Amino acid sequence: MLDNKKLFLNKSSVNKLMKGLLNINQGKSDHISIPFISKPFIFKLIEQASNLHFRKAKTLVGNSVTQDFEVCFPAPRDGAIDTLATSIESLFLEAINSLDEPPIKSPKFNDIAMQRYVSGSVGISPHKDHKKYISVIIIVTLSGRSNFCVCEDRDGINAKISDDRPGNILILPATGFKVINNVFHRPIHFVNNIRDGRLSIGLRQNSEIN
């Protein structure tokens, strides 16, 4: 678990990530959720976020995706955010090096965004992350209560609520993730039912950035 001012990878986190990566590879799952961040370190991230500049996100983007939140992008990779990114990269490196045939290369996060939703926000409608994002996408909820769901289509059919409680890292496969039948589909997901607001951070590897 990642704690305040120190990086510590326990075997449990590594094993859960290894199992989760294999489950996605074998078509048994479409995401991973792992307890990883301590409450004191979450407070550090929230404190850093309070000093960042947020702007209103565009209401409509891409393939008719509706958004109702404020965003800080690009969020700086320094301070507690850098510690978080480095720690997750180390977690992946440890897990991937322990697999005989890892489905991805270890990610390097060069695209970081923070999102802030107010209570009662409609969230973000079902969508796929852009294909330029490779390996995995990491979502970390820092505060608030809401539903992060993975579904089958853009109508939200067969939505499954993921465990994105503060302290967990939520992992979605991205472009280049190897699956057993070689037919990979980027997960469709959305956020709704926002109570008490929501503050989250997303970490991605953008293939268009050197």
What are these regions (language model features)?
Residues 116-119, 132-148:
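Short, conserved beta-strand element in jelly-roll/cupin
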